[in-house]
Design a protein with these regions (language model features):
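Active-site beta-strand termini and strand-to-loop segments that position acidic
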Residues: 315-321, 345
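C-terminal helical cap and adjacent loop that interface with cofactors, partners, or active-site loops
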Residues: 26-41, 45-47, 55, 77-78, ...
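C-terminal segment of classical bacterial N-terminal signal peptides
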Residues: 16-23
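A structured beta-alpha segment of the ubiquitous adenosine-cofactor-binding alpha/beta core
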Residues: 117-136, 140
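Predominantly a Rossmann-like dinucleotide-binding segment in NAD(P)-dependent oxidoreductases
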Residues: 187-189, 194-307, 457
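N-terminal Rossmann-like dinucleotide-binding module
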Residues: 27-112
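Beta-strand-loop-alpha-helix segment that lines the small-molecule cofactor/substrate pocket
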Residues: 137, 143-144, 148-196, 210
């Protein structure tokens, strides 16, 4: 009898392992999976009735992109500054949990002579912002925990949405953003700036042209020792009593590659993911936690026995077409900054770190349109500088040609500005954005899928199909461009609008009136100053509406 009970208990335990509901700490409650021949198969939920995919999604042209920013701590202020230099943009609202941070970003608008933005603050300030009818795009740059709720609110209120990375923290959030984008027919773009770095854009051009032959393997990473930065991350007063800062706290509580997109995004584009190929399976492994655990113990003065994330995480992925991708994450240990970015093809090789280089033999370089200047060229070594420079020039990206110079002036290497300018360009010209909601899901899901793998002895885990059957409809990744005449017309209108806005603001002395409100000594004086500002602001808005 006891033996029978043991057998029953053992069978129950085995069945529990194959339960359709994942229970690991960092997983979303709705994630369903089952075992199949040693692989964890993650289910793909059916597309709700009435929804259609958003591959190649376009929206009506927006002559003037009216944007609101939510989250103005670390990344947000730079985004506000960049948008002040993009023609055809109106910055309508600035929002942060802390009002002073939102108000502090007005300086960028003032410096460029643009109209002051409305300020929103507090834990739920973004909700009122998203309800406004005069906003086209909500740009989300909050802490990770608020990426999803703000984006969800924006999409539910009919706004195009752009979300800093990682844009979704688990599969449940990925699927909800997909469903909202499909339902509302609004763009939901992941703000993966590394796709716009100069080397990555040129390598993408080369991969698309077949310079490397067929790309079979790729590597990417986010390796960045954050010791100098941990103290600058905001501590949410409602859930961070130890003041660890949101990023350290998230790594303590969650396992997996929680920041995969910088390394994964650029190589996924080179591999045409959900544009002729798709990720099918991954296996993840991590080291034990040493540095993060020590940081928390030093910060709190208490033992930390529950630090989830390892110092270094490695994820291996396979695609339907037999390609392999390796992604690494390490923000803990002392080593040089590194995103790897390596492409191994049947006819060539590209690598970005520790220095940018290309390996091609003489015949392949010639076939790629560059004549070698040396006789002993071999793919066993990297191209000499002259040949390398010629190759880079030949495969220069149109995006760099258009935005590269001003991008470098805007800081952070220029890639942030090119990302933002391209997004505005596509919205103004009614084109598909460079990254869609399926990219967002594919690049962000490594956190949960990797955690599921590692929590089950590094088992293989299948990817859900975020396109739900449409990953092979589009053949090859590409950037969209408007016809030259349409592009020129949109650009002329954008520049005219921005100059008109600046002229109206200057004529009304709007910033003098705005500053007078803050300088008022009492309530009566403040009310009087506010009335004068509101009157002038309304006049400026009316003038801007005619531009």
């Amino acid at each position: 009898m006891k033996f029978k009970k043991l057998i029953v208990c053992a069978m129950a335990a085995v069945l529990a392992l194959g339960s359709q509901t994942a229970t690991a700490q960092s997983l979303s409650p709705s994630t369903k999976w089952h075992w199949d021949k040693g692989t964890i198969v993650v289910d793909t939920p059916a597309r709700p009735a009435g929804q259609q995919h958003v591959l190649g999604l376009t929206a009506p042209k927006i002559q003037t992109v009216r944007v609101a920013f939510v989250g103005l701590g670390m990344r947000g202020p730079g985004a506000v500054n960049r948008f002040c230099h993009i023609p055809g943009v109106e910055i309508v609202a600035l929002c942060d949990y802390v009002a002073a941070r939102a108000e502090g970003c007005q300086k960028y608008l003032k410096e460029q002579g643009l109209a002051p933005a409305d300020i929103y603050s507090g834990e739920k300030g973004y909700e009122e912002l998203c309800k406004r009818p005069d906003i086209d795009l909500v740009y989300v740059a909050t802490d990770w925990d608020h990426h999803f709720p703000v984006a969800k609110c924006a999409l539910e209120n009919g706004k195009h949405t752009a979300i800093e990375v990682p844009s979704a923290m688990n599969l449940e959030q990925c699927w909800e953003l997909i469903n909202l984008s499909e339902k509302t027919r609004k763009h939901c773009m992941i703000l993966e700036n590394c796709c716009y770095d100069y080397y990555e854009l040129r390598a993408l051009q080369m991969a698309q042209a077949g310079v490397f032959g067929e790309v079979l393997r790729a590597e990417g990473a986010y390796i960045h020792n954050l010791d100098d930065f941990w103290g600058y991350y905001w501590s949410n007063p409602s859930n961070d009593p130890d003041k660890l800062g949101w990023r350290m706290k998230y790594n303590m509580e969650n396992r997996g590659d929680v920041y995969a997109t910088h390394g994964l995004g650029p190589v996924a584009q080179c591999l045409n993911i959900h544009r002729g190929d798709r990720f099918t399976t991954l296996v993840a492994m991590d080291t034990k936690s040493v540095h993060g655990k020590e940081y928390v113990e030093k910060k709190t003065g208490k033992p930390c026995n529950n630090y989830r994330n390892g110092d270094h995480t490695t994820t291996l992925m396979r695609t339907a077409d037999g390609k392999v991708v390796e992604i690494q994450h390490n923000v803990m240990n002392p080593q040089p900054y590194n995103r790897l970015f390596k492409l191994t093809g049947t006819k060539g090789y590209a690598t970005k770190y520790p220095s940018e280089a290309i390996a091609l033999d003489k015949s392949q370089l010639s076939a790629s349109g560059v004549q070698p200047q040396v006789d002993n060229l071999s793919s066993h070594g990297f191209l000499p500088q002259a040949e390398y420079n010629a190759l880079m020039k030949k495969y220069e990206s149109p995006i760099i040609k258009k935005y590269g110079e001003i991008g470098r002036q805007m800081g952070h290497g220029g890639m942030d500005y090119m990302m933002d300018a391209r997004m505005v360009y596509c919205l103004q010209n009614g084109l598909p954005l460079d990254m869609d909601v399926y990219d967002l899901a594919e690049w962000c899901c490594l956190a949960e899928l990797g955690s599921l793998s590692m929590d089950n002895n590094c088992a293989a885990v299948s990817f859900p199909d975020f396109t739900r059957g449409h990953w092979n409809d589009v053949k090859g990744y590409k950037h969209a461009y408007a016809p030259a005449a349409d592009e020129a017309a949109a650009e002329a209108k954008a520049k005219a609008y921005t100059q008109g806005q600046k002229d109206a603001v200057a004529a009304a002395k709007l910033w003098d009136l705005y500053d007078a409100v803050a300088k008022a000594q009492n309530d009566k004086a403040r009310a009087k100053a506010k009335k004068a500002y509101d009157k002038a602001r309304a006049k400026v808005k009316a003038q801007m509406a005619k531009l």
